[in-house]
Amino acid sequence: MSQTSTLKGQCIAEFLGTGLLIFFGVGCVAALKVAGASFGQWEISVIWGLGVAMAIYLTAGVSGAHLNPAVTIALWLFACFDKRKVIPFIVSQVAGAFCAAALVYGLYYNLFFDFEQTHHIVRGSVESVDLAGTFSTYPNPHINFVQAFAVEMVITAILMGLILALTDDGNGVPRGPLAPLLIGLLIAVIGASMGPLTGFAMNPARDFGPKVFAWLAGWGNVAFTGGRDIPYFLVPLFSPIVGAIVGAFAYRKLIGRHLPCDICVVEEKETTTPSEQKASL
């Protein structure tokens, strides 16, 4: 990370990076739902994964490319991330997701309107939830609230644990510039295998920001509830955070502690004062 990188610059990077991955991902889903594109689950998952990889390449040198509140919180708790940056990062991520969803909607506006007119869909009705799913995630109708929470928790735990593994040079061969692509591939694999259950949110900003936009764009409360008695937005908002904490904890305790180097060593060296460095010589 550049020594001249400031919190403002890092927040801008998180805003742009999160916005970029939402632009590609939501754009792909919009193409599928209202433009007649013929994407299967694997193609959609790959596009999301590549979008994340591109966003990481864009922002990693400035902010570390968290792009996800669950990742930010887990890194704060288990990888020495500065707690003073947690809230600014999360706000930037949610704002980036919101703005990207709005941008995709603006670019596809005529197609959304024509699709609703052709299929006699009243925006804001329960029948419009599927179209609202262009922007954020909703569960398979055959699973309940608790099952959806469990799915998101498990897949985010796997995501977080493997992110730490892929970015930990002490764990095997250093990945360097390949790490973003490997993380993108990881997301694609998770999406292809578990996406049909909940839409593989794994990211509170990715889901909540676009849900707020959909609410403002006319979908109203159904954007948050998903047409269910218990508001569904609570699942992708909180379950990924729990999952990321579990995944980071599991990696540190089951894998990281047995490696020759510690995740926090770099951060500790960076925070050591010149006088402390001299004293240690």
Curated annotation (Swiss-Prot):
The chain crosses the membrane at residues 6-34, 40-60, 85-108, 144-169, 178-194, 232-254. GO terms for molecular function: glycerol channel activity. It catalyses: glycerol(in) = glycerol(out). It comes from the Bacteria. Keywords: Cell inner membrane, Cell membrane, Membrane, Repeat, Transmembrane, Transmembrane helix, Transport. Residues 35-39, 109-143, 195-198, 217-231 are periplasmic. A motif (NPA 1) lies at residues 68-70. It is found in: Cell inner membrane. A motif (NPA 2) lies at residues 203-205. Residues 1-5, 61-63, 79-84, 170-177, 255-281 are cytoplasmic. InterPro entries: Aquaporin-like (IPR023271), MIP (IPR000425), MIP/Aquaporin (IPR050363), MIP_CS (IPR022357). The keyword Transmembrane applies. Aquaporins contain two tandem repeats each containing three membrane-spanning domains and a pore-forming loop with the signature motif Asn-Pro-Ala (NPA). Mediates glycerol diffusion across the cytoplasmic membrane via a pore-type mechanism. Homotetramer. This is Glycerol uptake facilitator protein. It comes from Shigella flexneri. The gene is glpF.
